[in-house]
Amino acid sequence: MNGAPTATYEADVGTKTTYRVIGHRNFPRMMKTMKERRHYLDDEATRSDLVVVWHYGVNWKKNSPARWSKVFCSIFKKATVYLASETAMKRNEEMFYGELDIQKSKVKIWMSTGWGTMLFALDVCETIDVYGMIYEDYCSEHPNDTYSYHYFDKARTECSYYASSERQTLKGHKFLTEKAIFAKWAAMYGIVFHEPSWDGHLKNSGNDTVVDTLFKRTFRDYEEQRESNSTKS
């Protein structure tokens, strides 16, 4: 996903970069220089067979990722870059807020690239095996865990970043909530999680079940407090 490398990390992540899913905010950051563009789009050793750019909250009439993709594909003939359609992104957004059971107008939270990648996989794969993704309760079960958020840098730890993001009531990514939704989808869509295994942590819930996560509880408390303050005033 995004700019995650394989070089020097082959023992953990392998060498395949068949598909690379990139968020629209990361796309221009990854393509600033000709060297970077060749790395992702042209070099046989490092380019992906297919680059998928998903874009959320963009102006569809002034869609800069679409322009960049056309330019890069005209320069690098081996590059294959696809953009998620407006219809697909609206569907993804509806699924996101529907699973959260929250009105979009009430918050400024957004989908992660992991969410976009999972939905891409659901669209194109018959079965899905996911490696290296922790389940919703992993951090509470491993309070001393110090694994980094990105395997290729040590800027911050995964669990601390997830927890702080989850506690932000009205903005940011909701990584643990997304993972709770993936656990719900596992049986529905044939998703299998490895390293760590999610056995014993799958929700086995119905299609209409709304997940109850740290973010959902935090948001519910916020709404109740706001309603209480409104009543008092």
What is the predicted function of each stretch?
Residues 1-233:
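Metal-ion/cofactor- or nucleotide/acyl-coenzyme-handling active-site neighborhoods
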